[in-house]
Amino acid sequence: MTKDAAQPVILWFRKDLRLDDNQALNAAHLSGRPIIPVYISEPAPGAGPLGAAQAWWLHHSLEALDTSLRQRQGRLVLASGEALQVLCALIRESGAEAVFWNRRYDPSGISIDIRIKQELEKQAIETRSFGGQLLHEPSRLMTGNGTSYRVYTPFWRALEGAGEPEPPLDPPAKLRLASELAKSEPLESWKLLPMKPDWAKNFSDLWTPGEHGAKERLRAFVEDALDGYKENRDFPAKQATSMLSPHLALGEISPARIWDATRGLSKRVSAADTVHFRKEIAWREFSYHLLFHFPKLASENWNNRFDGFEWRNDDGDFNAWRRGLTGYPIVDAGMRQLWRHGWMHNRVRMIVASFLIKDLMVDWRRGEAWFRDTLVDADPANNAASWQWVAGSGADASPFFRIFNPVLQGQTFDPDGDYIRAYVPELRELGAKYIHRPFEAPRSMLAEAGITLGQTYPKPIVDHASARSRALAAYNATKDSASTRSSPRRAG
């Protein structure tokens, strides 16, 4: 081995906490150089402040990655501070002549990485960045006019037309990990886990963070739930979704690995189910496409006609929504599921978002921030794009006048009330006929179920019909005032 080949390469882990299908890791391995694996806790991370729920996940995910590296006679170096300063210190200490990483696609992360690349190259340090966090680079799929996509369906067609993604890379059988590593900070010193009271105490009942947990979740989904996915996915009481989103959010599994797992299943899984699931993966791709081309997606209306919308932003309403005390059972069940498990079924996410934005007229950005803090799968692109989609202000958004009726949504997608009973125990004894509208149940039936509205369970904080009319009036006023303004912002 040449002298240059013996110099270590720093492998900078970010939101790619896995050994499987890790292009930066594979390139470092193929270089033949000793690898120094490092994770840096940045004071201003690229994707914005780390939410409390995802901090819990990150703690356990880093533990899992460190365990995997120790099984290969290495370990994960933990360091905190400005990434450039940390990397320069590691380079001086180790003599490393290269830094490899997998790309991130949030605006702040992109600018940080560009600066680091420029500064390290001034020092004659090799830097190499790789894809793998998405099926396709956001700049690759463009319209025939060379512009970014603004509507999902043409984007999906373009993704299909791009051909099958490259097969995922298996982890190297052996890794040459550096034997002499820099001192690592204790993970506990980062204080990622909640202090008392431990509001995350129920998370581990549902989740196993780490690469192994991701692989097991994928295996179980493909074997047990992919068949019938299209029909069952909207029903929150059914175990019918992949629940891979938290693993994807921190890169414990790659989208290419998930996509690959759906190949060759035609004998036992219908093509319709496979395609529908792949379309959900493509929605994540579309969200990152939007964020890449419209960097202010998380803070500004994609459609600037909504800039003049008159939000009520009542703090009392917002707090009732956060606590799951709105008096609408499907909304309350969703918000309590979020608090208990750091996750919420996708159909219910749309329902609770519509209720906050349209029934309560609270700015979508407040809901987005709450989700970012309480979701274990918080994702800068998915979160912002989804909230703007519901608000009607986003790309290819649901029209604002499409206002979910929380009672009808509950009756349609939780007809027996099983989801409600799981998360709103006050209503457990109420029959299916009234469980989605206890405020209309006869007093005798409420008494028999042990329910006193306004005491054991809240009365509705808003009348849906009146709230709908109020929201539409505000929307029409905004539409009228914007009639002479410019068209929606183009992504770019």
Question: Each predicted region: which residue ranges?
Answer:
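Trp/Phe/Arg-rich N-terminal binding region typifying the photolyase-homology
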Residues: 1-167, 382, 386, 465, ...
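Soluble or luminal CAZymes and related metallo-dependent hydrolases
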Residues: 57, 61, 210, 326, ...
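Intrinsically disordered, low-complexity boundary segments flanking structured domains
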Residues: 25-27, 62-65, 115-116, 136-142, ...
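Alpha-helix boundary/capping detector
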Residues: 54, 95, 117, 125, ...
